Amino acid sequence: MTDAQTAAERIARLRSEIDEHNYRYYVLDAPSVPDAEYDRLFNELKALEAEHPELVTPESPTQRVGGEALAAFGQVRHELPMLSLGNAFAEEDLLDFDRNVCKGLDRGIEVVEYSCEPKLDGLAVSLLYEDGQLVRGATRGDGSTGEDITANVRTVRNIPLRLHGQGWPAVLEVRGEIYMPRAGFEALNARAIENGGKTFANPRNAAAGSLRQLDPKITAGRPLEFCGYGIGRFEGAEVPQTHTSLLETLRRWGLPISRELQLARSVQDCLAYYRAIGERRQGLAYDIDGVVFKVNRLDWQRELGFRARTPHWAIAYKFPAQEELTELLGVEFQVGRTGAITPVARLKPVQVAGVTVSNASLHNMDEVARLGVMIGDTVIVRRAGDVIPQIMQVVGERRPADARPVEVPRQCPVCGSAVERTQLVKRGKGRASLSEGAIYRCVGRLACQAQLKQAIVHFVSRRAMDIDGLGERIVEQLVDTGLVKSPADLYILTFEQLVVLDGFAEVSSNNLLAAIAASRRPSLARFIYALGIPDVGEETAKRLARALGSLTRIEKALPEVLIWLPDVGLEVAHEIHSFFRDEHNLTVIGQLLARGVELQEEGELHAEFAACASLGELLDKLDIPGIAATGAKKLAEAAGSLEAVIGLSQDWLTLNTTKGLSEKARQALREFFAVPANVEHARAIEGQLREFGMHWESERRCAEGLPLAGQTWVLTGTLESMSREQGKARLESLGAKVAGSVSAKTACVVAGPGAGSKLAKAGELGVKVLDEEAFLALLRQLES
């Protein structure tokens, strides 16, 4: 045997031994050798690899020192979004969560088992293993897109570069938290002070800052640890049936999980766990800011599903935020994207939960009045959720004699325009009343540089038009120099205008122009979100685009039509309608389209939306006093058409014999339709329903005309030709409902590579199964 062969065998044995010792130390918390012996083995391996560099492999324990520095982090698209959790701040919140879980399962279930884990205060990450090898690490980012931090996560000592044991799937995505233990944090800050460097405010900031170092050698020198709490992709093996058994399986594969993991048999056990760990919180080796409870059965998790950004089956019960006393030195007013004038408290700096707090949100003037706060007061400040500083109350007995009231400026502090108090319109049962709102607003709109800057920052953000490289500093320059006076002006910027700006050169100017050009083809949903319509977030924009299908329909839609969308209430509907009635907004939209913005993914009205209108619902949405949903339905059945209802309202004899209506309702119906404006408005709504294809007379044709109408389909595994979302959208466009679990009512399951329990369930129930090739063939046939 040659020296190289002998060295290769010894290196392999050393790596195996060291990996086993790491597993016992970091995962089992049961080291089997003294530190000196571990160091001897590690140093022997380093020496052998130095002698035989051709035998060095990326998964070797010696390779955690970090490689070459990066110029920037790449982006990683999460195939399965990394969602955030809903929060509970009181026992009643947790009890409500438990009640909603039981109700959502809809089986008469009264007691649910939950997994319990401390909520670590670190940075959420995704670790991707292929064939047992760590191939990628990524931050959570916005939940859909994160940053590639593979080089940095490889330096974290307790993250296995290769999975332990056997039986792991071909593709395994582990999700968890990278954090810095308190002892390591204190040692890191002590070294920084010793070397005259900058210290970190708390372990969370230290962990986040360490992971975002472009030089992985710096990260390698930081005392970081990982704790797994769940999975994303899991392909090529059967997923365990419960969350706790899943975590134990991850532990067997060498991935650290919380040593505080427990199973609660009921919500009362959850409360007991929360109280117990809260009492031990300060004695833990790491910072936690609450407890995470998850429905333990994974099939129940799938059945309960998700909201837009949070699961129905998990919740984070936060610990009370830490509070301190300080002095209110003054109040400044900031101007937001919509012109809202927001009071911000300037405080005498104070340490709260390890962070120096000098500012706090006062939200609005109603909050100022509720607190009764005056400048000069001693106040209790806390970091709500351990993040956002808030003033909780005034210590009245410490109020100084020269305390001054907080007054709203009459002119905008930025542009000098008038400041007006918003008027709230309360609508209901055919009436509208005005009252003063809590918000004061600058009337300057885009003539106000503060509003313009914030509007453009929102317009170019990642979830909106996604113009890379156009940050707040550059937006400020563009606005301050007068180059940009509306979002549409971005699309007529020239190289000559950019290259003379501070911080710009030839390359950066060309890069920005290229990024602007690349944003010219946004999806309809992104464009709607980018416009910054008040109260229209990303999810509402997606619903508008998916349901109405075109900008023209969205612009024309009446509030009473918009409220047919799920989760769009009347107030939001009126905000949308008002936005598109505003001539200035229409001018900006027109300029954007004229300057080359081409909307993608526009199409027909979605079948699901087209099938939701009825005469009874229309009458109910008119808010006729005295006529609720049941009465509206009976009235619709009796009359049969809107014109018949209008006629009936004036036909006293026939109206008196109409069943299901009280005398009060009959009188209200007569009075409502006696007003010409009400008749005109009702006809306008019906006309728009006809125009959009939502009218009850066209409802049946819309539904029956779709080949998969009434069918429930399930997608499982990985589709190679499209994403799962694209597959879902194509099925829904054909009338199908796409569900997350298989039942006897499922019409068909589309199974790609890595399909697991859903495919097995389909086999048990005799549900039809299509592979991707057959699925594509069916789509081509039905879509042609």
From Swiss-Prot:
Binding-site list for NAD(+): 35-39, 84-85, 117, 140, 177, 294, 318
UniProt EC number: 6.5.1.2
Residues binding Zn(2+), per UniProt: 412, 415, 442, 448
Biological process according to GO: DNA repair; DNA replication
GO cellular component: cytosol
Pfam (any one): HHH_2
Entry keyword set: DNA damage, DNA repair, DNA replication, Ligase, Magnesium, Manganese, Metal-binding, NAD, Zinc
Cofactor needs: Mg(2+); Mn(2+)
Catalytic activity, as annotated: NAD(+) + (deoxyribonucleotide)n-3'-hydroxyl + 5'-phospho-(deoxyribonucleotide)m = (deoxyribonucleotide)n+m + AMP + beta-nicotinamide D-nucleotide
InterPro entries on file: BRCT_dom, BRCT_dom_sf, DisA/LigA_HHH, DNA_ligase, DNA_ligase_AS, DNA_ligase_CS, DNAligase_adenylation, DNAligase_N
GO molecular function, one term: DNA binding
Active site per UniProt: 119
Domain BRCT: 703-784
Family note: Belongs to the NAD-dependent DNA ligase family. LigA subfamily.
PANTHER family linked to this entry: CHROMOSOME TRANSMISSION FIDELITY FACTOR 18 (PTHR23389), DNA LIGASE (PTHR23389:SF9)
Physiological role: DNA ligase that catalyzes the formation of phosphodiester linkages between 5'-phosphoryl and 3'-hydroxyl groups in double-stranded DNA using NAD as a coenzyme and as the energy source for the reaction. It is essential for DNA replication and repair of damaged DNA.
The protein, known as: DNA ligase
Species in which this protein is naturally found: Azotobacter vinelandii (strain DJ / ATCC BAA-1303)
Gene that produces this protein: ligA
